[in-house]
């Protein structure tokens, strides 16, 4: 049996641009892609914290060190520059693989610079007033 598990997550990234007339996808800074274990063309889910919309698209590699989080194509109707988003990739694992799998969690600041890396899915952004997801009722 395969289980679908979280593989990579960029938490609370700020959307830098949205272009309705660009070929559909999400452009992500290559540094963030590496940290979250994402590859060009990989399917990701994008959760818009600002308005609650969720969408599925694929990744395009953005300029390294630029902080770019660009929403392209039809998804630009659901996400606007300045919105906070969570970008999530999943992987299918056997039970044996699941036992040793560690997700890649990337926390970023308002400029999409990496502030912390980890594998705890419930850990809040360091230095924020967020509560751990593990502590919620």
Swiss-Prot record:
Cofactor: how and how many bound: Binds 1 pyruvoyl group covalently per subunit.
Q: Where is the protein found, in the record's own terms? A: Cytoplasm
Gene3D superfamilies, alphabetically? 2.40.40.20
One GO BP annotation here? alanine biosynthetic process
Q: State its Enzyme Commission number(s).
A: 4.1.1.11
Q: Which cofactor does it need?
A: pyruvate
Q: Where is the active site?
A: 25 (schiff-base intermediate with substrate), 58 (proton donor)
- Residues bearing Pyruvic acid (Ser) are 25
Q: Which residues are noted in the entry as substrate-binding?
A: 57, 73-75
Its pathway is:
Cofactor biosynthesis; (R)-pantothenate biosynthesis; beta-alanine from L-aspartate: step 1/1
Q: Which CDD domains match?
A: Asp_decarbox
Q: Which UniProt keywords apply?
A: Autocatalytic cleavage, Cytoplasm, Decarboxylase, Lyase, Pantothenate biosynthesis, Pyruvate, Schiff base, Zymogen
Q: How is it modified after translation?
A: Is synthesized initially as an inactive proenzyme, which is activated by self-cleavage at a specific serine bond to produce a beta-subunit with a hydroxyl group at its C-terminus and an alpha-subunit with a pyruvoyl group at its N-terminus.
Q: What sort of enzyme, by top EC class, is this?
A: lyase
On subunit structure and binding partners, the annotation says: Heterooctamer of four alpha and four beta subunits.
Family to which this protein belongs:
Belongs to the PanD family.
Q: What is this protein's function?
A: Catalyzes the pyruvoyl-dependent decarboxylation of aspartate to produce beta-alanine.
Protein name as catalogued: Aspartate 1-decarboxylase
Species, as recorded: Thermobifida fusca (strain YX)
Q: Which gene encodes it?
A: panD
